[in-house]
């Protein structure tokens, strides 16, 4: 049972949400009085409460979603809130649906989407993973952060071939190394206000670090927003090469580190928007003609479930007609299907851009 002080804070937060008439978050939409009353006293076995779930969305009324999972159990215990939010965000992943088993499919079905190198600047595929037996950020102790980091760094140091590289802990990082990682766009910063409010940045920078291979085409973030973010990327449009590298890395890491998986929701992550496959496949792409015809761009994006962002990711502008375009769907389909949908959409956008020239 949650403590009285926690429940008092929850009541206060609920009032704040109710009063915020211009708040458009999914939290506000689905945290009805009856759901609130049903959940406000509950506590996971690791001690997480509804407050841990909603505090970021209460503090930041401009959140799009507004909830995070403090641990794996939260997705089950607070399902009356999470399930409708998940269904709404992952369009059509109903509360009775079950995410399919992991399936990377035939990796040779993926191609270079821009062999002439005229449109795609770079290609990236990432996934998130949580380590079994550990809660998510808000519930982690300093000792757990250290323990996880040592497991991750020893696992990664065993990688061979193209994946062979170096692990750089954020703790005690020299200015030179730091600058080099910033120049390569590899370094992650302490979380934004949404993550800060969710208590995702405690004991910073303990337990956080970055691994990259010698070619700088493979990257792992340890204990940023998720326990692990596994990233494969390179300049140009060779999605096939990028995807194959990611798949072999995930398979190698999984042999040594068991991942948190949920029968219904797939791979578990801190933020419910990343659940399921957790896969985000994206390109930085120059589409000057389509940039001038935003309506057409959005129409094609909608047809292939693509998300169009500005050059520097979420909440940014497209600089010089360069967009960050990725698959939007992560749940209710396989990894293969998610990336294939993105490939089909990008090929279509390039075809239309050429026709408009």
UniProtKB/Swiss-Prot annotation:
Cysteine disulfide links: 201-271
Keyword flag rRNA processing: no
EC number: 2.7.3.3
Key words of the record: Allergen, ATP-binding, Disulfide bond, Kinase, Nucleotide-binding, Transferase
InterPro entries: ATP-guanido_PTrfase, ATP-guanido_PTrfase_AS, ATP-guanido_PTrfase_cat, ATP-guanido_PTrfase_N, ATP-guanido_PTrfase_N_sf, Gln_synth/guanido_kin_cat_dom
Stretches that traverse the bilayer: none
Protein name stated in the entry: Arginine kinase Cal b 2.0101
Source organism per UniProt: Callinectes bellicosus
């Amino acid at each position: 049972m949650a403590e009285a002080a926690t429940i008092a804070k929850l009541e206060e937060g609920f009032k704040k949400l109710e009063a915020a008439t211009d708040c458009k978050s999914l939290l506000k939409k689905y945290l009805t009085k009856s759901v609130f009353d049903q959940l406000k006293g509950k506590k996971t076995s690791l001690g997480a409460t509804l407050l841990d779930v909603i505090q970021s969305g209460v503090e930041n009324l401009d959140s799009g979603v507004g909830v995070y999972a403090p641990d794996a159990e939260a997705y089950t215990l607070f399902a009356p809130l999470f399930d409708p939010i998940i269904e709404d965000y992952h369009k059509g992943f109903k509360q009775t649906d079950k995410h399919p088993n992991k399936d990377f499919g035939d990796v040779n079905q993926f191609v270079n989407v821009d062999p002439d190198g005229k449109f795609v600047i770079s290609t990236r595929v990432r996934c998130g993973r949580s380590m079994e037996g550990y809660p998510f950020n808000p519930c982690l102790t300093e000792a757990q952060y250290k323990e996880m980091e040592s497991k991750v760094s020893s696992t990664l140091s065993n990688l061979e071939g193209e994946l062979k590289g170096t692990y750089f802990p954020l703790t005690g990082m020299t200015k030179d190394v730091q600058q080099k990682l910033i120049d390569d766009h590899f370094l992650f910063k302490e979380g934004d206000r949404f993550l800060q409010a969710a208590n995702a940045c405690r004991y910073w920078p303990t337990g956080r670090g970055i691994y990259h291979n010698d070619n700088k085409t493979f990257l792992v973030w340890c204990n940023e927003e998720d326990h692990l973010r596994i990233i494969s990327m390179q300049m140009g449009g060779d999605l096939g090469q990028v995807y194959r590298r990611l798949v072999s890395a995930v398979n190698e890491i999984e042999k040594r580190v068991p991942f948190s998986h949920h029968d219904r929701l797939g791979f578990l992550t801190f933020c419910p928007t990343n659940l399921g496959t957790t896969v985000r496949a994206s390109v930085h792409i120059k589409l000057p003609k389509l940039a001038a015809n935003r309506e057409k761009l959005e129409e094609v994006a909608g047809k292939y479930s693509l998300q169009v962002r500005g050059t520097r990711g979420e909440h940014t502008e497209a600089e010089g007609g360069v967009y960050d375009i990725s698959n939007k769907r992560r749940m209710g389909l396989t990894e293969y299907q998610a990336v294939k949908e993105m490939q089909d959409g990008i090929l279509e956008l390039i075809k239309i851009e050429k026709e408009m020239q």
